[in-house]
Amino acid sequence: MKNTVKLEQFVALKEKDLQKIKGGEMRLSKFFRDFILQRKK
């Protein structure tokens, strides 16, 4: 469970960066979608 909390904090930080970085938005959003789908399994 500790890992889950750390991952959620990491994702939250990356989402803030994502808003700043428009160029890599498509690539990062795809990465997050795949990442979240993997966690649900």
From Swiss-Prot:
Gene Ontology molecular-function annotations: pheromone activity
Cellular component aspect of the GO annotation: extracellular region
InterPro entries in UniProt: Competence_ComC
GO biological process: establishment of competence for transformation
Main location: secreted
Localization (cell): Secreted
Membership in a protein family: Belongs to the ComC family.
Function recorded in the entry: Acts as a pheromone, induces cells to develop competence for genetic transformation.
Protein name stated in the entry: Competence-stimulating peptide type 1
Species this protein is from: Streptococcus pneumoniae
Classification lineage: Bacteria, Bacillati, Bacillota, Bacilli, Lactobacillales
Recorded name of the encoding gene: comC1
